[in-house]
Structure formats: structure tokens, C-alpha cells
Amino acid sequence: MPLSTSLLGKKNTYKDSYDATLLFKIPRINNRNVLGIDSNHLPFYGVDIWNTYEISCLNKNGKPLVGIGTFYIPADSENIVESKSFKLYLNSFNNFIIESIEELERIILQDLSNVTYAKVTGRIFPINTKIEFGIPSGKNIDNLDIVCNNYGPPDNSLIEYEDVLVEEEIYSNLFKSNCLVTGQPDWGTIVIKYKGKKLKYDSFLRYLISFRNFNEFAEQCAERIFIDIKNSINLDFLSIYIVYTRRGGIDICPYRSTDKSYTLPNDKRLIRQ
């Protein structure tokens, strides 16, 4: 279905009964074709991590159950899920009577797997679960004194490197893009790990800032950055992790890596989550 038929950016009525058909799928192939990515031979591995903070249903006695969900959608899934549709879908459980949170978890995982055409994993945690906060372990490049005048579209010519080999992690809290459909701001922290020729921090920060007024879905921004870096520098290893802040009770954190046996970033939340 075309994106224009989705519920994103439209006034919607919340349904009071569970409805899996609310989930709206978006084929990944469309944006990947634009980026020159062969969907049959992806240049990366990874996952989209969805953290959902507004999950509730009713138990057999009519008492509300609540939880926080984390779901992992493989980067090689055929489709992504449009976030507004996922929010409406989750809220359709609000008056749904169910045996337990575990049963709700099973239903959500199955529905997400059905719509993405991939095996989605994850779980729903109790609200009283202790969550640790932290900061990325790498070098923050935000304090560089740079002049910026390009806020979109992204300018990959700004990705420059020095003739020195490094293995490092850098990050920025200044990343921002906009929703492809509504234009609403998506704020995030981006973490880059790589091994190869050293990125020039000042020009690379300007590159990241050139996404500021650019309209693109979160997952697609991560893949664009991955491809732009990969095409600019011959690296032995590269991973991209964007931790977006929540909107509508959901935050989306795409992770892409050249390493097939990648290890997911630690589960510490950032302060803006």
C-alpha cells in the first residue's frame, strides 16, 4: 500500500478493541533502491530496536496490566512498521482481556513478525524494572567550534578523512531529522564505531547536522549515513547506532554493522529516553 494511505499525519480515532490490521507496513526496498542498496545482498547486518512505553491491557478480572516493551526488528526484514500505526495498534489492547502480560507479548511478537515478514523478538518488562542510564563510551564531538550553513539535504561530500589509521567510537547528541510524512522533529544521539582511516571530526559533524531539516524515517537515516561513510572511506569495520528520543510513547533505535556476528549496544538508556 502507498504511504499516502497510512494513518500517519491524519486525525485518528483510537479503537477500543484489539486490531492487528492497524499495523501499516512500509517496504524497505523503496528507500534502499534510492541509496543503491541491493536488498538481496545487504552491505550491513543489524536491527531496529523499538522501545514502547505505553503498553496496557486488562486481566481476567478487568484490572489493568501495564509494561514497557522492547522489540527487535531485523534489518533484513522485508518491511518496517509505520510508527503511528504501531501506536494505534498498541492502544487497541487497552480494553483487551488477556491471561497475562506474557500472552500479550506473544501476540505482539507474532503480529510484528507477520507484518514485517521476519522473526521479530523482544519482551515486555514490568514497569518497576530498574533501568540504568548512561552515556556512550566514545569521544563526543559536539564541542567543536564549527560554522554550519547546510541543514538539508544531507551533504556526503562533507565526509572527509585523515591519512592515519584508527579504531575508535565517536558520538554526537546534535543529530536531528524530520518525519518523512508529518515533518515532526526526530531528535537523537548517533554513535559511530569504525576501524580504518580517521574521520575528520569537524567536517563529519557538519555532515550530521546537514540532516537537521531533512525528512526521512529513522531507519532510513541510519542506512543513508552507513552508505555515505562506506562509500567515502575504505573501512575494515563500521557500525551506526542512532538512539532517537521517544515520540508518541515510542522510540526507535536503528543499528547497522558490517559485522555479521555483531553485538548489540548495551541496554543502558540515554538521559533523553
From Swiss-Prot:
- Species of provenance: Rickettsia prowazekii (strain Madrid E)
Which residues does the annotation say bind substrate?
A: 81-83, 218-219
UniProt enzyme class: oxidoreductase
The record's function comment reads: Catalyzes the NADPH-dependent reduction of 7-cyano-7-deazaguanine (preQ0) to 7-aminomethyl-7-deazaguanine (preQ1).
The catalytic activity, as recorded, is: 7-aminomethyl-7-carbaguanine + 2 NADP(+) = 7-cyano-7-deazaguanine + 2 NADPH + 3 H(+)
- Which compartments does it reside in? Cytoplasm
**Residues noted as binding NADPH in the record, renumbered to the chain:** 83-84, 247-248
Q: Which SUPFAM superfamilies match?
A: Tetrahydrobiopterin biosynthesis enzymes-like (SSF55620)
Pfam families registered for this protein in UniProt? QueF, QueF_N
For molecular function, the Gene Ontology terms on record are: preQ1 synthase activity
Which cellular components does GO assign to this protein? cytoplasm
Mind listing the GO biological process terms from this record? queuosine biosynthetic process; tRNA modification
Q: What is this protein called?
A: NADPH-dependent 7-cyano-7-deazaguanine reductase
Xref: InterPro entries: GTP-CH-I_C/QueF (IPR043133), NADPH_dep_7-cyano-7-deazaG_red (IPR050084), QueF (IPR029500), QueF_N (IPR029139), QueF_type2 (IPR016428)
Q: Which UniProt keywords apply?
A: Cytoplasm, NADP, Oxidoreductase, Queuosine biosynthesis
Transmembrane region positions? none
**Protein origin, superkingdom:** Bacteria
Q: Which NCBIfam families does the UniProt record give? A: QueF (TIGR03138)
Assembly, per entry: Homodimer.
| EC assignment | 1.7.1.13
Q: Gene encoding it?
A: queF
Query: What does the record give as its pathway?
Result: tRNA modification; tRNA-queuosine biosynthesis
Q: Which family does it belong to?
A: Belongs to the GTP cyclohydrolase I family. QueF type 2 subfamily.
Catalytic residues (UniProt): 179 (thioimide intermediate), 186 (proton donor)
Q: What is its main location?
A: cytoplasm
